[in-house]
């Protein structure tokens, strides 16, 4: 039976592994929040926020969403974001900053598209408005 193991296809690497794992996500998230906080349309959402804690949770979330080894332990997206006035326009801006941070970190454009595709279904839990109105 050991011979059969040699002919099995290797499991495809997760996006998490392909982009460099936890350390790469820390770099991306740091750059991402520099961009988000510099955006006048978004910075107000973070007034009074413990950014170190938020960045840690964001890394944990992205790691879990992209096939990392550990589950996300934060509160549900809807619970965290409800009542904050986040619109689909804001969601699109954030997605654009994420794409830019990933690209700046050297993530290939095809992988950036995969990541945005993995995050897009969360739009209705984070923002108010129609999910189809997200533009990046």
Swiss-Prot record:
The protein's required cofactor(s) are namely:
heme
Keyword annotations: Heme, Iron, Metal-binding, Oxygen transport, Transport
Cysteine pairs forming cystine bridges in this chain are none
Example GO molecular function: oxygen binding
Cofactor, how bound (note): Binds 1 heme group per subunit.
Q: Which InterPro entries match?
A: Globin-like_sf, Globin/Proto, Globin_bac-like_CS, Hemoglobin_trunc, Hemoglobin_trunc_I
The source's domain of life comes to Bacteria
Residue numbers binding heme: 81
- What's its job? Binds oxygen cooperatively with very high affinity because of a fast combination and a slow dissociation rate.
What family is it from?
Answer: Belongs to the truncated hemoglobin family. Group I subfamily.
Q: Outline the subunit composition.
A: Homodimer.
Please state what the protein is called.
Group 1 truncated hemoglobin GlbN
């Amino acid at each position: 039976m050991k011979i059969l193991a040699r002919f099995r296809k290797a499991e495809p690497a997760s996006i998490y592994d392909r982009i460099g794992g936890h350390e790469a996500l820390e770099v991306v998230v740091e750059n991402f929040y520099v961009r988000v906080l510099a955006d006048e349309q978004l910075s107000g959402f973070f007034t009074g926020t413990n950014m170190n804690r938020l960045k840690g949770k964001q890394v944990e979330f992205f790691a879990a969403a992209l096939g990392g080894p550990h589950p996300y332990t934060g509160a549900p997206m809807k619970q965290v974001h409800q009542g904050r006035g986040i619109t689909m326009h804001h969601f699109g801006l954030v997605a654009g900053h994420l794409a830019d941070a990933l690209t700046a970190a050297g993530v290939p454009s095809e992988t950036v598209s995969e990541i945005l595709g993995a995050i897009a279904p969360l739009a209705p839990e984070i923002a108010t408005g129609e999910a189809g109105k997200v533009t990046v």
